[in-house]
């Protein structure tokens, strides 16, 4: 029997503006394909972004908002970020964050019950060794019942596709990749680096560096503490990193901006270590680190493309999984 797709509209990832439009969910034979980008800073789906902070409560929290109820325990999600760990399958909280992310994505379409095929990813150089363990981790419960923000969800997991982080964000743009290109996926915990030559990813030329945005965050907070003797809110530093400014006095802003410029300089220094030469190749940047390069970096804008859509990788996961499942028939 030939496989048929649902009537749910499907459009290429790059044509969607997440600020104004919904990225339509892929579906095959009544199975929802849901992508989750497990970041150290944020959990992303095709249409949602949630900070990875999570805190457990034995009783229902006083304040509402982003509350997951699972196995009799309440979890408030979205306050702060998680610490870096090299193997997410060793951290049970990422499973809870996955359930939350799926619920948020389903809620966009007012869906409460679904057969789900997950699409997710791992850092480029870790996927070979961690793929099967992470797949088993995500599929540990074939059927799950839970509540998120007071709404009940019933999921049946039917499969899971895993991809290298970063690359899926640009897979729909490969037609523009002529000659030598370098992809840098700068997340909260790591920077993944991949060469793409004549539209083909070079698996032998990929690296993962622990040089994520969180290192800049820590350095900025420490610099303020050392120079002024005060602690600064992480949310204030994050605003400066994202937008280049914040409503604080000039000395504090200058201090944090200086650290951000040093961090971006280190990013480019690391890329050069892997033979990055702006005269000979184009650089594509995905992930949250792109805004730091834009705000604090010195670079040739005609040779560097910063992909602003923080959900681009999740959309890519979803597209790749949909195409793969459709080919299987």
Model-identified regions with their sequence ranges:
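Ser/Thr-glycine-rich phosphate-binding loops at phosphate-binding pockets of nucleotides
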Residues: 186-192
């Amino acid at each position: 029997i030939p496989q048929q797709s649902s009537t749910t509209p499907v459009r290429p990832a790059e044509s969607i503006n997440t600020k104004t439009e919904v990225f339509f969910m892929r579906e095959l034979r009544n199975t929802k394909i849901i992508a989750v980008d497990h970041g150290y800073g944020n959990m992303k789906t095709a249409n949602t972004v949630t900070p990875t902070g999570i805190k457990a409560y034995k009783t229902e929290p006083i304040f509402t908002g982003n509350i997951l109820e699972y196995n009799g325990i309440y979890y408030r999600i979205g306050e702060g970020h998680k610490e870096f760990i090299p193997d997410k399958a060793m951290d049970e909280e990422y499973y809870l964050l996955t359930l939350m992310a799926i619920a948020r994505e389903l809620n966009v379409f007012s869906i409460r019950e679904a057969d789900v095929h997950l699409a997710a990813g791992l850092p480029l150089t870790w996927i070979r060794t961690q793929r099967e363990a992470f797949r088993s981790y995500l599929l540990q419960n074939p059927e799950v019942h839970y509540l998120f923000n007071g709404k009940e969800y019933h999921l049946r997991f039917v499969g899971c596709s895993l991809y290298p982080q970063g690359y899926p964000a640009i897979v729909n743009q490969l037609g523009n990749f002529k000659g030598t290109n370098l992809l840098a996926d700068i997340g909260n915990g790591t920077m993944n680096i991949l060469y793409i030559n004549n539209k083909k990813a070079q698996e032998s030329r990929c690296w993962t560096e622990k040089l994520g945005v969180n290192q800049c965050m820590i350095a900025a907070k420490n610099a303020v503490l050392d120079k002024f003797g005060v602690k600064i809110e992480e949310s204030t530093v994050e605003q400066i990193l994202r937008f280049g400014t914040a409503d604080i006095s000039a000395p504090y802003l200058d201090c944090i901006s200086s650290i951000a410029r040093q961090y971006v300089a280190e990013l480019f220094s690391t890329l050069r270590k892997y033979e990055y030469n702006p005269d000979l190749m184009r650089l594509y940047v995905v992930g949250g680190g792109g805004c730091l390069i834009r705000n604090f970096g010195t670079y040739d804008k005609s040779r560097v493309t910063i992909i602003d859509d923080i959900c681009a990788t999740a959309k890519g996961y979803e597209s790749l999984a949909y195409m793969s499942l459709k080919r299987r028939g």
